[in-house]
């Protein structure tokens, strides 16, 4: 399916199709991300190169948050980005871990740093911050210098000391 025809195939799911740096971007209503991504995978976009989130707090856009899926079709070497928009009140999308196993840790990272939940994920727990960490540090409304929580992080001692050079 050419990406130019995807809006015709999913008229209720696709907000628009744009292009940046000669690569297409498909803007999707969040609740339809799994349907659209499943179709794209069956049409040859078989590799999830990256999955990340965007906080549009100061940028505007369809919703405050978007999850960007960067896909690659190995057969044609074509790249494609799908941006699934997440309403701030819901902060939830269907997980794509069933389509691409490498989405496992990437979805956990987005959950940990932005607070976006991925429904159906097999193990959605924090991956970088302590499990009792309060907040989501990559959100634009998170204090730039933190909330003094770093003073409570455990200190990890190095198992060795640097040796002094003798000449």
Model feature map: region roles:
Residues 1-167:
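Terminal low-complexity/charged segments
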């Amino acid at each position: 399916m050419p990406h130019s025809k995807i809006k015709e195939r999913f008229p209720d799911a696709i907000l628009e199709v744009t292009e940046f740096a000669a690569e297409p971007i498909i803007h999707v209503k969040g609740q339809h991300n799994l349907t659209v991504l499943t179709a794209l995978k069956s049409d040859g976009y078989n590799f999830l190169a990256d999955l990340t989130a965007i906080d549009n707090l100061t940028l505007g856009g369809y919703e405050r948050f978007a999850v960007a899926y960067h896909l690659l079709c190995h057969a044609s070497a074509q790249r494609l980005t799908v941006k699934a928009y997440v309403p701030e009140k819901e902060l939830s999308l269907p997980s794509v871990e069933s389509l691409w196993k490498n989405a496992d840790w990437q979805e956990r990272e987005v959950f940990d740093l932005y607070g976006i939940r991925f429904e159906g994920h097999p193990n959605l727990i924090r991956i970088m911050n302590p499990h009792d960490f309060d907040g989501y540090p990559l959100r634009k409304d998170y204090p730039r210098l933190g909330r003094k929580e770093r003073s409570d992080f455990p200190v990890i001692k190095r198992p060795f000391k640097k040796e002094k050079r003798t000449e």
